[in-house]
């Protein structure tokens, strides 16, 4: 299966708890951290919920 790289670009400070949990679920906990995950509909959905906090890196 294809991989996707995600970089945290925004701070979770002053964000709703649900958005913080999505970041933790994606494995992101520090600014500018990059993780590589399987490209699944679940991961794409999580990214779609917090586009202001993450960016997809090629």
UniProtKB/Swiss-Prot annotation:
Keywords on record: Ribonucleoprotein, Ribosomal protein
InterPro entries cross-referenced by the UniProt entry: Ribo_uL30_ferredoxin-like_sf, Ribosomal_uL30_bac-type, Ribosomal_uL30_ferredoxin-like
Keyword Ribonucleoprotein on entry: yes
A Pfam family of this chain: Ribosomal_L30
CC annotations in GO: cytosolic large ribosomal subunit
Superkingdom field: Bacteria
Keyword Ribonucleoprotein: yes
GO molecular function: structural constituent of ribosome
Gene Ontology biological-process annotations: translation
HAMAP family recorded: Ribosomal_uL30_B
Subunit architecture: Part of the 50S ribosomal subunit.
Annotated family: Belongs to the universal ribosomal protein uL30 family.
Protein name as annotated: Large ribosomal subunit protein uL30
Organism of provenance: Erythrobacter litoralis (strain HTCC2594)
């Amino acid at each position: 299966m294809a991989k996707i790289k995600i970089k945290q670009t925004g701070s979770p400070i002053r964000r709703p708890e649900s958005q913080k949990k999505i970041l933790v679920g994606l494995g992101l906990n520090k600014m500018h951290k990059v993780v590589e995950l399987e490209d699944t509909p679940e991961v794409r959905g999580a990214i779609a919920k917090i586009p202001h906090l993450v960016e997809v890196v090629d």
